[in-house]
Amino acid sequence: MSAAQAALIPDAAVPNGGASVVSAAEPSTSTSPEPIDISSLEQRTLNPDSFLYSELARSHLGERASTVLSVLVNKGRLSTREIHSFIPELSLSSIKTVLVSLIQLRCVQYLEETSLSGRKTLYYYFNEEGLFLMLYAGDISDRIVQYFNQDEEQHLVNIAQQIIHNVLALGSLTVKDYLASESNSNDTDIFNIHQAFVRLADLEFLVPLQGIHYTPIVDLWNMLYLREYKKLPKNTTQSDLKKRNEAKAKAKLEFNRIVSSPSQDSNGKIFLTDSGTGFKKVNESVSLTFNLERYLKSRRSNQLVQFAKSRIGTTSSKIYAVALSMTEQHSNGLSHPLSKTGLFQDLDERTSLEEDLKLDEENVKGVSFTALDVARRLPSNLDLRGTLVHSNQSLKRKQKHNQSPPQFEKRIKTEDGFVVPPLPTVMEESEEENEEGDANLDLDEDDSDPRSVSLVNGHLRLLLTANIPFIKESKPGQFFVPYSSLIPILKSSTYDSIIASTLGPSSHRVLRCIRDNGLCTERTITTTSLMREKDVRTVIGTLVKYNAIEIQEVPRTVDRAASRAVFLFRIKEKHAFNTMKLNLTWNLARLISKLETLKEENATLLKKANRDDVKGREMELLLASEINQLKVVNDRELNGLVRRHRLLSLWEVFKLF
């Protein structure tokens, strides 16, 4: 175990961004080399993840980095000599140089192990976080701007974007290094730089660089668990099962402490107080890196806002966006680190963690909000007046009910001549619910405030009472976002949309019939979908081909012949979503590959057009054929970038959420 990883207990940052990795000695062990050739699209379909990561690395870092990453993705953890055995055309020193760059960009993690003979070996692991940062690099820069006030903090926006660009390009950055690159800045500019760093650190987009960023989660868990297990006394009467459970409980506490402290560095707090001005500033000697988990929370919020827009409406989705932006920083992450350790093979552990996360969604400080909180943060150009249906709609229903033809009732007299009055009209249950709903949305039509609390509360009630639980109410007037129950619905809805748009509405109809009925026969599907039997069979064959549904054979008798069996159909969403994820991954990688091929085929023309003496004078210095070809290249590249953005928004739902 290296010094950086040993410093995880207690916390310590990796010195020099992990540059000390290459100085360790590797053993001479080697395995039989197996060439990895993904030149053809057929071979790339065997591992779409490897295809995507290799293309990303090739487009951003070059051919050598792409080759090294491909080996690590396909073969797992390897030492430098083992990597060299798979890539003999690269020298050992070149591989080490590439690994240093990949480690600094968080594309590779490492761990030092000591064998029984005492020999220390550094093993390298592929880390997809660095590739995700490359994949989202453009959107990260644009999304950061949304967290600044465009009117009052425009001077900080450009600085914040430059800081993020430098952090993504270098992997990590200190305030001191950034100020050194801005040596010509005056005192006002330096103050603004400090304020931009403070703002990004407050939002947790920048966090201190720690050993956890370079350590594989699974190996970290194994180290903590073995350490706690070895501490237990061996001469006690406790069973081995109790010892393991005790060690597991202690290791979980230490593991959660390590992975859930992004705002602390190894030497103390990240924030300091400037003795001269009294303002808060970031410690200039602390290495900062980008917090991918925090950014993915904002991507999740954007997906939920678009989902609410399609189901509730545009105005309510804007209210929802403000509520999510208030709470996303303190909300649960997309996945808990313990889910990557293998503990979820135990059903009790999985259930316990899921219950804890559900409680955190409601009880953690900063995750709940009220209508007043949302109203204070609404944009000034948003006018909510006239966006809700008022209670006068219920009056129309009452009038319609009163205008119904009268029902003549028989008059009943008692023995003494008393006439029994008719029974009062009982309102139906549906009408009562409608009146209750109207009462909840009973607003003042003469309200002059376009962003009043009553209007905001009306939209929150729409989100609360919808069939999809966009928000829930923990206390009267206090709401929270139930991510654990909302994300599965988002996945199913996205999957249905893809099926409907690619395979047609008939496939979507059959898929919904099977989902609603569970395990069902072909006759049941034909009856409920109101389709012909021949069409149903064709659609079922297509859905089975794409792993959207599964076939289960149920024998009717002891005879197992196929002719005497009944075939039922069901949906297993885990398998269906995984197939869709692999499909989208391959298409995304293929699109990136085509864009890179387009640039390579027109490299000479692009190089000529990007020369300083040609820019702005293309019509004068380029031939007509070159101008036409340049226009074709630009159009194809723009079209490819739009398609990439759309694919990315679909891919992340199944890959990251």
UniProtKB/Swiss-Prot annotation:
Gene Ontology MF terms: single-stranded DNA binding
Region annotation (Leucine-zipper) maps to: 584-605
Which keywords label this protein?
Answer: DNA-directed RNA polymerase, Nucleus, Transcription, Zinc
A GO cellular component annotated for this chain's UniProt record is: RNA polymerase III complex
The keyword NADP is annotated on this UniProt entry: no
Any Pfam family: HTH_9
Where does it reside? Nucleus
InterPro entries recorded: POLR3C_WHD, RNA_pol_III_RPC82-rel_HTH, RNA_pol_III_Rpc82_C, RPC3, WH-like_DNA-bd_sf, WH_DNA-bd_sf
Task: Give the primary localization class.
Answer: nucleus
Where are the residues of the annotated region Disordered?
390-450
Q: Which GO terms describe its biological process?
A: DNA-templated transcription
Residue stretches of biased makeup (Acidic residues): 428-448
* Subunit composition and interactions: Component of the RNA polymerase III (Pol III) complex consisting of 17 subunits.
Q: Which family does it belong to?
A: Belongs to the RNA polymerase beta chain family.
Q: What the protein does?
A: DNA-dependent RNA polymerase catalyzes the transcription of DNA into RNA using the four ribonucleoside triphosphates as substrates. Specific core component of RNA polymerase III which synthesizes small RNAs, such as 5S rRNA and tRNAs.
The protein's name is: DNA-directed RNA polymerase III subunit RPC3
Q: Which organism is it from?
A: Kluyveromyces lactis (strain ATCC 8585 / CBS 2359 / DSM 70799 / NBRC 1267 / NRRL Y-1140 / WM37) (Yeast)
